[in-house]
Design a protein with these regions (language model features):
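Sec-exported extracytoplasmic/periplasmic mature domains
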Residues: 50-59, 107-111, 236
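Active-site-adjacent bridging/hinge elements
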Residues: 18-29, 76
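Active-site nucleophilic cysteine motif
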Residues: 40-54, 93-100, 287
């Protein structure tokens, strides 16, 4: 088939996806995915993208799963609320994060299928977070303790997000606890977290110094050429990639027919230039998407990214980032270790 693809929260801009006359677009095959979702007014792109990557990885293996972001959001908010309570309101509740945080929460709390706990379409996570903080401040003033706090939180979450599923979930006739289901979705050590910066030695792991790395996840540091090779190899062998990077660039805010490029002044993209962008704070950890394919346009490589801003954005929820854009603006990538062998 011929493919024309046109802050973390949903942006209302619409991307035109008409291929310019005279452009040569090479045919491509996209990795199979679950339906595009819409994170709405929430900063949960990291959860949507990492779950989407896991879902596509399972589809590739002949297994179909569709996972609940709402469950993770609820578990995270409850945990953050307890931290807020014990800090006497000095530790703010933030729902931002990085892709590996999703794995952290799955390992800790398990996961449930999307059908067991769906996203409510009209919920505003920013408003819910403020309600949680208000509830916690009252709890601090009253010194009610954790059990009563959790009881009040659960009533709030039930009202705003819907009632939690039973302690066991059912999938293809089998019965699982959320923890057991999580082990079937993402076993420990299944994914590798990768980055590429020169202020730490290559070949070593370090906690990325980004504000959203709340759980201090560590990433394997590799040269950018090697990171790009890992991404290409994964995609060419049918494995999705969870991409995390900067979308504040002019090329992303105003893509040309759904294709995103760096500015001519930013070429060539090198290890040194991406380090300068990061250290000058021009490359920031803005957004997370799932890479599901590669495409060649006028003999230049682009990576097809599945977003979480609904299927009315871009080309049915997708956009193409150039290889130079990835080289310059990637913060991190999460890839199945099977794809790295």
């Amino acid at each position: 088939m011929t493919l024309c693809i046109c802050s973390c929260q949903y942006k209302s801009s619409h991307t035109s996806c008409n291929t310019p006359q005279g452009s040569v677009v090479q045919e491509t095959k996209l990795i199979s995915t679950t339906p595009v979702k819409n994170q709405g007014k929430s900063p949960l792109c990291w959860a949507y993208a990492m779950l989407a990557t896991m879902e596509s990885e399972h589809i590739m293996k002949g297994d179909s799963v569709n996972l609940s972001v709402a469950y993770i959001a609820r578990m995270m908010l409850q945990e953050k609320a307890v931290e807020f309570y014990f800090s006497k309101g000095t530790k703010p509740i933030s729902m931002r994060g990085m892709a590996p945080m999703l794995i952290h929460y799955i390992n800790k709390y398990g996961i449930v299928p999307y059908d067991s706990y769906e996203d409510k379409k009209d919920i505003d996570m920013r408003v819910l977070r403020r309600k949680v903080e208000f509830l916690c401040r009252n709890a601090i003033a009253q010194q009610i303790g954790i059990e009563k706090l959790k009881s009040r939180l659960n009533r709030l979450f039930d009202d705003e997000m819907g009632y939690m599923p039973a302690k066991t979930v059912y999938m293809l006739g089998a019965e699982y606890t959320p923890e057991e289901f999580a082990n079937s979705v993402c076993f420990p050590g299944e994914y590798e977290m990768l980055t590429s910066f020169t202020h730490h030695p290559f070949g070593e792991r370090f906690a990325l110094e980004t504000p959203d790395n709340q759980t201090q996840e560590v990433f394997l540091n590799v040269p950018i050429d090697q990171l790009m090779q890992y991404i290409r190899n994964a995609i060419s062998h049918g494995h999705p990639v969870c991409w995390e990077g900067d979308i504040s660039e002019e090329g992303f805010r105003h893509p040309r027919h759904g294709f995103v490029d760096v500015l001519p002044s930013q070429l060539p993209t090198t290890q040194a230039s991406r380090q300068r962008e990061f250290e000058s704070l021009r490359t920031t950890d803005d957004h997370v998407m799932e890479i599901i394919g590669m495409i060649s346009k006028n003999h230049r490589n682009y990576y097809v990214c599945r977003n979480s801003w609904g299927n009315h954005w871009g080309k049915a929820g997708h956009i193409c980032l150039s290889e130079d854009y990835l080289r310059l603006k990637t913060i991190a990538a999460v890839i199945s270790k099977e794809a790295l062998r």
